[in-house]
Amino acid sequence: MHNTIYVLGFRHQTTPASVREKLAFSPENILNTLPFLQAQCAGAEILLLSTCNRSEWYFASNTPPRLEEWLYQHTAISSEELKRHLFIYTDREAVQHLYRVACGLDSLILGEPQILGQLKAAYRLAKKAGSIGSWLERLFQHSFALAKHVRHQTDIGKNPVSVAYAGVQLTHQFFDDYSKRTAIIVGAGETAQLVARYLHDLKIKRLIIANRTLNRAQQLAESVGGYALSLPQLADHLHEADMIFGCARADVFLVTQNMAITALQRRQNTLQVYIDLGIPHNFDRNIDNKENAFLYDMDNLAQLIDKNRETRQKAAAEAETFIRLYSNDFLNWTQEKPQQHMIRHIRADAHNIRQKLLIMAYRQLAQGADPEKVLAEMSYKLTNKLLHQPCALIHAIPPDHKDWLAVVADTFNAELPK
């Protein structure tokens, strides 16, 4: 059966954070969602990539996926938002989009490596959910190989940057000497770890990690010489921080407007900067309306990040050449006849059988076995193993199916009994 590759989704270039946060899926949500969506889409192969900057559904299907209907029913997105922001790519356009994502060419920060890890995590979740078949398996393995190739053959990975780096960079507009400053990081995941590392390198005076799970906060805090808090303790310590980074996944604001007002009062209204890297938002956006409280979110960061793009444009152009080559290779594979897939599979199985028996023979020879006996035994086993499946198939053919028997006889140049 010939499938078509589809990509449907929402990304930072065309969808504001206020809409993207309605489409944020936790790993648990994804595991529960994929089998249900697969059943609704007539058994299509499906992978869901959900990050701060994008939610994208990848399909391999012989019919167009009915994702819009599912989104209406299972998310808070409105019909107007869906029509305005949903993108749909098919075949070559879809394949090249995935390859650009894997290489970091579609990221908020051009060439950032974090997305490849997120893509691999999404792949593992889809494998666990059982929603990946041979088409998406090949497509995503291809994308991983391409991303590795581009990293090694171009300068796309030089001077590494990330959303976390851009968030820390933004605080330079307000602070010079970090050895006199205190920072709070809300969350303990990958983005929080990057922020902590950057601040640690800047010789931050005091670093506080607040997380839902105290044990994870303690682990991160220990790695950077910081202090750990549980989330319920955050309000009591908020006034201590000059800068607060939101890096958690949460359904409610982790810092409300009232919490920020109280913190400002306790610190005699001295400057505080909030950097919200969370999707959904970690911080109440009304905080930005308060004097001496400045809030920046992912949409604000996009403006800063644009300045960093120029240094990677040349490498991106080189990467596009590899993307075209890899896309052609994958699309040529999709156009192969089913017989070619079958032949390749049969040959691969035969090669594996030969290789295993050859290794056994080498071991026997190394132990001093008689070479003639080893070769005779190997050839006997090889013959039996290669003929096992065809013989089992012949045994399974009903005697009255003369046409089937004739095809098999012709294939193996054998005579049918009269």
From Swiss-Prot:
Its EC number is 1.2.1.70. It holds the Pfam family Shikimate_DH. Keywords: NADP, Oxidoreductase, Porphyrin biosynthesis. One of its GO terms (molecular function) is glutamyl-tRNA reductase activity. The record marks 97 as: Important for activity. The keyword Iron does not apply. It is an enzyme of class 1 (oxidoreductase). Homodimer. Belongs to the glutamyl-tRNA reductase family. Possesses an unusual extended V-shaped dimeric structure with each monomer consisting of three distinct domains arranged along a curved 'spinal' alpha-helix. The N-terminal catalytic domain specifically recognizes the glutamate moiety of the substrate. The second domain is the NADPH-binding domain, and the third C-terminal domain is responsible for dimerization. PANTHER family: GLUTAMYL-TRNA REDUCTASE. This is Glutamyl-tRNA reductase. The gene is hemA.
